[in-house]
Amino acid sequence: MLLHLIYGPTCSGKTDMAIQIAQETGWPVVALDRVQCCPQIATGSGRPLESELQSTRRIYLDSRPLTEGILDAESAHRRLIFEVDWRKSEEGLILEGGSISLLNCMAKSPFWRSGFQWHVKRLRLGDSDAFLTRAKQRVAEMFAIREDRPSLLEELAELWNYPAARPILEDIDGYRCAIRFARKHDLAISQLPNIDAGRHVELIEAIANEYLEHALSQERDFPQWPEDGAGQPVCPVTLTRIR
């Protein structure tokens, strides 16, 4: 079985690349993302719309209400192993995402050391200014009012009605920044979807900068695998960490 691993920081184009390869190969994509396992925060977690998937298959490691909490890394890794093992008779599978903890679980596990051929592609952060331009565009899209999905701010306003969800939201990029923004400006969370244009731009910039901080931590803490078709990228002999 060929495993095509695509990993990199947020806003680096991983999902678009995975969809393109899925279109070319017909293989499903398994999302290496713990936050995307909560459909109630589909927009803020970056889950692609059905229309964006272009008839390709995307597999999430769980589907749970946010009040149950974010799936922990070890549980996500067990579910990933199950998905891959169950599909071992297939020609290939695409693994795509940027969960630091899940990728490091993979790096430590003997499961990935044999029985697979690998193609590994790592996307890089690159220039910070270019990243912020992409991140601002992405956040603006998350703020857009759409018929097929609530905006990030609408998701936040709805979920804020559930006290059990609040500490979880305060620990997720984007939502955390919006909550702090509301407190700074003495706004109720329910007011955020209707803020004026000036504050809208200010919040977009703030979230983009939070994404940059997260991307820098991803670049620092990701495991590093040999790229371009290495046979066993997670073997301890070849695995290193970026420091």
From Swiss-Prot:
Organism (species): Agrobacterium fabrum (strain C58 / ATCC 33970)
Stored SUPFAM superfamilies: P-loop containing nucleoside triphosphate hydrolases (SSF52540)
Pfam families xrefs: IPT
This protein's UniProt keywords: Crown gall tumor, Cytokinin biosynthesis, Plasmid, Transferase
UniProt GO MF annotations: AMP dimethylallyltransferase activity
EC number(s) given by UniProt: 2.5.1.27
GO biological process, one term: cytokinin biosynthetic process
Catalysed conversion reaction: dimethylallyl diphosphate + AMP = N(6)-(dimethylallyl)adenosine 5'-phosphate + diphosphate
Role played: Transfers dimethylallyl groups to AMP as part of the biosynthesis of cytokinin phytohormones.
Protein name: Adenylate dimethylallyltransferase
